[in-house]
């Protein structure tokens, strides 16, 4: 009896959840049942249903829409705006420490969640909507934070090295205290203010997830955080969520009309920890509709860095213009048929992104990347890392070896670190002891990490000048004795010692440009255990007095250097630069490509033939290779791929370059704004030049180049859904052309 009841409950729970589409395509703004047919014809695979606060709790209009969606077998996400509605924003604050907000939130969720949770095709909930900008990072919350972090005012005063008489310290006052005592204008009080803002947003997102789960415990109903409109909010989403919806529109964030700030997807994935479905701009604020080729390019860029689909932010923009609607439908159909479900990028390089430095500000002065600054007018002048880490994301997101991942300090776990060979760590200021230990183990196991100024600042005794013991040992450092700060501080880097990590950078090579690629902060260090690889500047501070031949002589002080150091650690290397390395340094500068390329290629099997910056975007994925032409011109693409076996790839010609190791050359031609997914369809032994042309869903044509010198074994790779495969094999060479027609059941060798 009990066993039967349990099965019944489980069956009912399973029925009360929609199926996640293999590729999630949706558009915001669908309101009426009459549009559902057009919505389906546009290729959409799911519904995005925005539910705003209603005092009366009447959702009858949504019920009519979702009843029809259920009949048409559409799954849907219910997007809840959990910010206080405009009429109540003067009454309470959007903050986890505001009791009035908690009362309102719980009442609203008590109304909306029970209404929708039993719907049969509910995929889950999206919680958010420009939450970072709406959160009240107020000084009352800062006081609560300080009380929880420090046991007494005496401890707070000791940590800040300032007399503090009350917990009610305004953040601006705390940060101005740093301005008066530190050359970098950033010390312990400012670090605490930044950590407060970071923690507040994290706690609010955690609160939302927990409150929703209390009212809907069905684990098949996914929780998505978003749409989130700052990179720093993507980096603090807690593990209570299964997915994230980034919306970094070029209208509001960086004006990246080429790729719609697609690195937001990499940030949100956090090394594959979250499902990511970005929202894309479809209509501008002035009413203009985005061109179809831009929507196609943005969608494919997002998929290349790991998106599971996209949400278009305005359904009417798609529905109103036939050209847009038809192109979107064709794009979705092609993705669903050509790109395997759940295809994910595979890269051995990641950026360790700490949401600290300001990076870039939006038009209203809101920091997009880090919590170091107060939002709004108080952000000026910039006082920390300027354009870092934004500059690094843009420089590396599509390079000659493919894509890069992004992880936060909370992904510094053995499991996630095992996926990478190289970590670039701009301003890695927050590293708890366990994170430091995992980072050291990563390097000892053969990894390479590149860090710069600010390393471990939160955990250091003197931020930006000393280092926690584990990091000091890992990087072979001592101390930074002096910080040279100023807008005119600019210099280049001169290599003083050749190193095998950089085989193409000789001793004496100058990295930079005519005005200097490094600054405006330099940290001067005395001699360290790690080897100096390159020097930024050398200074002698003070004088030394020595006694020689009965006389006291004054000699120049001990030299202190701003430099890049390389420390061998276990089987790997830890590299440290005593400046904000990527504030000014870009791919346009001499040596940028040699430095980064030498490291990235160590873990990469794929490479685009050409320069560091390529005309095409390439993503090596676990089920093939995605190649995108974002330009207005025809592109001939040539790739080199190191693999254990020799593959025939759809849409490309493949020929062997070498056998030990096995390297194959892949060539194809892409029309403007076009893309191709190169899927392994067969492997050949021995390696032999082959061109594959897909003739239909279950039909292929293989053209073998050159004359056969013997037997060639071809093993076909077919999806499990394939019932049969018709193959035409054409042989070109000195003998007349011959054709072989085969009809194969799946998993057959010829």
Predicted regions and their residues:
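A glycine-rich, often tryptophan-bearing local segment used as a flexible ligand/cofactor-contacting loop or short
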Residues: 429-510
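Extracellular ligand-binding/catalytic regions of CAZymes and related secreted enzymes
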Residues: 292, 318-346, 475, 539-700, ...
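Conserved small/polar residues in nucleotide/adenosyl-binding loops
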Residues: 740-746
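Aromatic-lined substrate-binding rim segments of carbohydrate-active enzymes
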Residues: 35-42, 46-93, 208-209, 213
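Polysaccharide-binding and catalytic clefts of secreted carbohydrate-active enzymes
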Residues: 95-99, 103, 107-259
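Hydrophobic targeting/anchoring helices
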Residues: 89-93, 216, 222-391, 511-516, ...
